[in-house]
Structures are given as C-alpha cells and as structure tokens.
Amino acid sequence: MNRLQVELPGLSLKNPIIPASGCFGFGREYAQFYDLSVLGSIMIKATTEQPRYGNPTPRVAETPGGMLNAIGLQNPGLEKVMNSELPWLEQFDLPIIANVAGSQAEDYVAVAKEISKAPNVHALELNISCPNVKTGGIAFGTNPEIAADLTKRVKEVSEVPVYVKLSPNVANIVEIAKAIANAGADGLTMINTLLGMRLDLKTAKPILANRTGGLSGPAIKPVAIRMVHEVSQAVNIPIIGMGGIETAEDVIEFFYAGASAVAVGTANFIDPFVCPTIIEELPALLDELGFDHISECQGRSWKQTCHSR
C-alpha cells in the first residue's frame, strides 16, 4: 500500500507534495538536482495568452519569516509553453497542473481551452488572486460573482478539472469559496500571497519597484491554516493547501485543517531538495502519529470537534 497516494479530480498523486506555481518555473532548474518523477505533481508557472515580461526591478525583498515578490506573471506565453515546456515535462511520470492567468475573462478562457488539450496537463489552476498585477487577477479573486462567472466560463471550455486559487486579501474567504464551488469548480488551492510592503530606511520609499508585493513563506502559515480550516468545512470540493510549508510536520498540519494535498512554494528557493525531503520524511511521521495512511489526517481538527459535540 502506498501510504501517501492521494486521488483528486483529474489527479492520481503518488504523494500529496506539489511544488507551487511561481516557485518552480517549469521544473528545468530543479531537474538538475533530482528526478521530478518523485513528486506528486507540479503546478507550472502561470501561463498567459501572450508573453509577459513582468514588473520592473527590484521585484523581490526579504522579510522576517518570508519574502515579498512582485514578479508580475513573467512567462513565455501560451505558444511556447505548449510547444516547448509541456513537451519537455512529458519525460517525467507526473500529472501537470497548469496555472492559467489573464487580465480579462476572455484571456483565461483562451488559455484554458488550449492548454487543457496538452496530454500531460491533468488539471488547471485559475490564478484569480495574484496581488501584484495591475489589471485583472485581484478583481476576479475578491468578488464572489465575478469569480463564479469566470469559473463557469473556464469550465465550459476546459477538457480537464478546474481548481481555483483563492486570495487571502478578502474580507470573507468562505463566501468566495462557496460561490466558486457552486459555479462548478472541481477543487480549490489556497492561499495565494498576502499583500505587503517594505520601505527603504534611507529613502523612505518602497523597496519594490511595484511598491507592493505578495508576502509568502513561514510568516503566512498561520493565516493559511486558519483559512483552509474555515473553507474546508464550508465546501464539498477538495483543497490543495499552501502557505509557508517547509517540513513534513507542516504538511500534516494542513491536512488536519482540511487539505487533501499541499503545495510547497518559497521553501524551494531556500532548499531545492525540500520537496523530496518532505516526501521521504512523511512515512516516519505517520508512524509516530499512529496513522496508516495520510488520508486519515484530512480534516481531523474539525471532524474531531464535530464528533465530540
């Protein structure tokens, strides 16, 4: 028995560990360190219809317990992803999750329709929540009606299941999650980065050229855990949890909150072996905690609470 195997809509994962979109590129750099086939899946870098060159520099700033980034969805565009990046990834035993972005609904639909045809793309992740793009993105992720409409439109053209990535920069994430689930989403991924800023001590000006950026890393983990805990009790679709994961213990905590798989982001920049290390350490941790299979951990925090009542 594979104690780590997870079955999700469109995704048969040998383990629940997935590098997060934007922190792993298309895997080429990390393939120099280890066989990517050990991973559960890969969330590839966000793809837009046309190439994007991203925001001006500086784009990254360190913070205590994390980092700020304002990359601006830099990517080679749909045509190159379809003709170069995805074919290259076919050498690995991996179901690919393609992250789709755009400035208007028509952009998402156009990319989703084409990229979902790729043989190794098993699911889409709609990036409706990126906080560092001047147009699009953030508007979709903060309005329940707009988010639901976009989900429906993409579902109509996609040949694979659709997961929607939620923004934490909202007043009521449960309301948005419910709207997206009711619109037919197959799953949710959460959370994206928190909007933040750093100021230069000498100039008193923002360090990032974009002024604001997305905060990621261990600093946001408690926020992510709380939001996964709330949303998982409100919807009946699976959640891929993310936000500050660095260890096998972090993975179990997300499962306890209600996640069915996890994505590892910023930690890949610090340690390129972080994902295979977590995969190797999970079985021993399951033994220590008394679980036969990782699925036994899913939702344990609130399921225990409900049972005790």
Curated annotation (Swiss-Prot):
Note on cofactor: Binds 1 FMN per subunit.
Subcellular location: Cytoplasm
The protein's name: Dihydroorotate dehydrogenase B (NAD(+)), catalytic subunit
PROSITE patterns, alphabetized: DHODEHASE_1, DHODEHASE_2
Residue positions of the active site: 130
Family: Belongs to the dihydroorotate dehydrogenase family. Type 1 subfamily.
Binding site residues for substrate: 45, 69-73, 127, 192-193
Principal localisation: cytoplasm
Subunit architecture: Heterotetramer of 2 PyrK and 2 PyrD type B subunits.
Entry's Gene Ontology BP terms: 'de novo' pyrimidine nucleobase biosynthetic process; 'de novo' UMP biosynthetic process
Named cofactor requirement(s): FMN
Stated role: Catalyzes the conversion of dihydroorotate to orotate with NAD(+) as electron acceptor.
Organism: Bacillus thuringiensis (strain Al Hakam)
Catalytic activity entry: (S)-dihydroorotate + NAD(+) = orotate + NADH + H(+)
Record key words, sorted: Cytoplasm, Flavoprotein, FMN, NAD, Oxidoreductase, Pyrimidine biosynthesis
Gene from which this protein is expressed: pyrD
Pathway the protein takes part in: Pyrimidine metabolism; UMP biosynthesis via de novo pathway; orotate from (S)-dihydroorotate (NAD(+) route): step 1/1
Domain of life: Bacteria
